[in-house]
Structure formats: structure tokens, C-alpha cells
Amino acid sequence: MDLNTPESTETCNTLIDVSRKLGYKFTVLKDTIEEIQALLLFKSTNLSSAIIAKNINREDIYNACDRRHLSSTDLNRISDNLEDTLVNHFKFHVIPQTKQWQGKAKFSKEFSIIRKYRNTDKAALHDAMALVYVREKRGEKYIQEFGKVNCWFVNNAISHDNDYSDTEY
């Protein structure tokens, strides 16, 4: 979708292409789409006043907007069409019902740790839910070999909100 750096977009596209050739399919939780839409709408609202964020984080959506000459209206359009783009262009499968993972995540160790570092409990719950989903798909197995892993959770792991150690969980 090219809302990060050109290098990141190229890396993501390569990851998608290679993964497809290896037979992987792509699945996204409905909650993930909603999180992305909320982020895009926030960025759209603040686009005209985002001077500092652009200079602090070169991977911020604001810099992609400058590079691609996107307006607030463009970001709103991207947000409105996000699910359709993921399904029809990128061929992702959407999991619409996530209550089972949401319930498990709410009482998980991960949620209690992540909520200390995320801006909202909703964002922390989403992250914990994704971890619970992957753990269930993997069958609680530890990764031994890259090629034998049946489920990956891919995200942009760089966060400028707060720094915390992944080894906590």
C-alpha cells in the first residue's frame, strides 16, 4: 500500500511474493483492519499539523504522504477501501469473527504486559489477540525450523511509543 518508506514497501512486496510461491496464504483479523483504519483516520486528521512526527520517524505515514502527495482525503479513501484492497488486490482472507481470541487475549499474560506500553487498551488487546491466534494456529509448538512453521504474524516491529523488551514474554 506504500504507506511507509519505499524500502519497506519493497520488502513487504517481496515477502508477499516469496511467501505465495512457498504456498503460504495471508489472513488478517477484522480487528487488525479496524486498527489500521483508526490509525489512518488519526493520521488524516492530523496530516496538516504533523511537522515533528515527520522528522522523528522517517517510517511514519506522514512521510509517505509527502512523498506520494497524498492528502487527508486520500488517506480517508485508503481507509474506507482497506478491506476491499486487502481482499481483492492482495488476496488476503479476512477473519470476521474474533471474539474467541479476544476473550482469551483479555486474560492473557501478554495483554497485561503489552497494555503497559500501548497507547490504549484496545491496541494492546489487539496485539495480544494476534499473539493468541498465532499460538493456537501453531499448536503451542516452538519454532525449530523456519520452513516448518505453519503460521506467522508479520508486523512493523518498530515502535516509537515506548521501548520494551520482547523477552518479557
Describe these PLM feature segments.
Residues 2-151, 159-169:
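Active-site-proximal, substrate-binding regions of enzyme catalytic domains
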